[in-house]
Structure formats: structure tokens, C-alpha cells
Amino acid sequence: MKILLTGAGGQVGTDLVPILLARGAKVACFDLAKAPASLQSGVEWRERDVTVPGEVYDAVKEWKPDAIYHLAAILSASGEKKPHTAWRVNMEGTLNVLEAARLFGVRQVLFTSTIAAFGPGLPDPVGNDVSMRPSTMYGVTKVAGELLGEYYATKYGLDFRGVRFPGLISAVEPHGGTSDYVVYMYVHGARHGAYESFVRADSKIPLMYMPDALRALVELSEADGKRLKHRMYNIQALSPRADEIAAAVAKRLPGVRLTFQSDPERQKILDSWPQELDDRPAHEEWDWAPKFDLDAMSDDLLTKICAREPNPKIAYRARAVSASRGTA
């Protein structure tokens, strides 16, 4: 199977490429950035702009992929600073990808949407098919992208599928997302021994560890289309408060100092999002099930972070954590 990834240099794409290669796919990457030094052999990299129709069309025509994983996007916090750029990248880029798929016979497009697609005031857990009235440009473009994909599916028969990701957590440092505070508790906690989060201690949103997120994309892509009743699916794994995350980090990094100082703009965005998602359709229609809870995520994440840090301020105490859990 041949797969093209847009936004391949981002937080999701960086980790998704080796997963797809391990499943036997031939992978081509499409990103405005240069190819990273860590790029696996055999992976093609195209330095292209998703907002330029001709560049997208040429890449799809040349590569002839069976599927496109459309990951390119400007995230929530960055999108509020540059809303016109967010519209161009997220909306025009999505239109270019869908039109290229139509023109050159791509079978499937996988789309990544977000909890930011939902607006404030919805009762938790937020269902899969509720009204979406987002309060950020990022959310607006993702809702529009979902609808555009539905249009191409209905009018042209494109196999359009997607997930609404919660806040994604990985060892790759994020850029421009409102849920970045979670990753920075782990990264800066190990690297510097301290971190001041830009949210309140009681802040709570749905989260997911990156290995679960990557598996969800691949499993949805490979799911039997006859079972699917939706195009877009809510998915989540855990919904801890910010201070509960801090406690999990502190248990593993003795002496770490984690504090909270709410930034009004980012807090406003965060407070407009759901605290929990109802993802029953994903469970029922393609057997979605997360594997990582807060403890499992914290153990794996700090193992990866501390392994790459040359001189971490605080060493990860894996044995102490394992012993404290007992056999439960």
C-alpha cells in the first residue's frame, strides 16, 4: 500500500511514519519543512506547500497513493495569533488534498480533527453527533474540513474517514497547541526540574498518548467500511485534571517543582473544550479501545524523555513507581 502524509514533520507525522513502514506500507512525506536527519531509509520526502494547489496535485499525481493521511494544520494557540494563516493552511490545504484525491483516483483520505471543533456549553461527555460551534479559528477550520470531506464522500464517492483527537501527548515537543502544558510538565520537569503551567490546576480536557492515537488512525483506515456508520469519530483515553498530571510526574521525578499560572487567552480556549468525550461509536463500529492510562503513559513517556536528555536535572525513578503500585 502506498501512503502520502501531509504535515509529516509534525508531532503526529513524526511518529506515524515508522508505524506505517512496520506495516509494510510505502510512504511519501509532504511538508513545508526540510526532511529530518532521522528520516528512515526508503521514505520519500517532498518539500511542498499544502496551500498551493499545483504542488499538492503534482505530488499526488506523481506518487499515486492508495491513501492520504492529511495531518497538515496550524494548531489552536498558533491559529489565534495568525487566524488568516490558519484558514489558508487548514481550510485551503484540506480542499487541495480532497480535490487532488478526486482528480487522481486516491481511494481514501484520513482526516485529523479535534476536540476544538466543539464549542462551550455542551454537557459532558460530549457526544459524537452534537452541534459544533467552535470558538477558535482552528476549531472553525476543522469543522469546515469535516463537512468538506463529507461532501466529497457523498458527491464523488471518496472514502473519507477521520478522528477528533483529544489533546495528544508524546515525547516530541509540541508547537502551538493549547494542550502543550501536559507535555511540558514531563519534558521541563525532567530537563529543568521545574515547570509553570499556563493553566489552572483544575483544568481538565480529554487526552491521549501518542501510541494510542497512531494506532487509532491506522485501525480506522483499515476498518471494514461496511461497519462504519459515521465519517468522523470522537476518541479519547483519559481525562485527568492538570494537578493530577502534576502529581503523576512528581511521583516519578522526586523534587520536581510544578506550579500553575493561568494565561487568560489559552485558558479561555481550554475552557471552551469538552472535559470528556463520548466515543461509543468508535468502540462499536471499529473496535476502538485505548491502552494507556495516566500511569502507563507517565512511565513510558518519562522513559523516552530521559533517554534522550543528555543531562536531565532529575532522573526518572521507574523502580520506585513500580514498587508503589503493588500488583494491582
Role assignments for model-derived ranges:
Residues 162-175, 184-208, 212:
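A conserved pocket-lining segment of Rossmann-fold NAD(P)-dependent short-chain dehydrogenase/reductase
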